[in-house]
Amino acid sequence: GIFGKILGVGKKVLCGLSGMC
């Protein structure tokens, strides 16, 4: 749902910023 999309985007952003992808 909506919360899943928000969490998914948040994880992608944190992944990109931390470089732990």
Swiss-Prot record:
Localisation: Secreted
Annotated disulfide bonds: 15-21
A Pfam family reported for this protein in Swiss-Prot or TrEMBL: Antimicrobial22
GO cellular component: extracellular region
Stretches of the chain forming a coiled coil according to its record: none
Main location per the UniProt record: secreted
Keyword annotations: Amphibian defense peptide, Antibiotic, Antimicrobial, Cytolysis, Disulfide bond, Fungicide, Hemolysis, Secreted
GO biological process, one term: hemolysis in another organism
Tissue specificity field: Expressed by the skin glands.
Its biological purpose: Has antibacterial activity against E.coli ATCC 25992 (MIC=15 uM), E.coli CIB 84492 (MIC=15 uM), S.aureus ATCC 25923 (MIC=8 uM) and S.aureus CIB 85462 (MIC=8 uM). Has antifungal activity against C.albicans (MIC=31 uM). Has hemolytic activity against rabbit erythrocytes.
Family: Belongs to the frog skin active peptide (FSAP) family. Brevinin subfamily.
Protein name: Nigrocin-2JDb
Organism expressing this protein natively: Odorrana jingdongensis
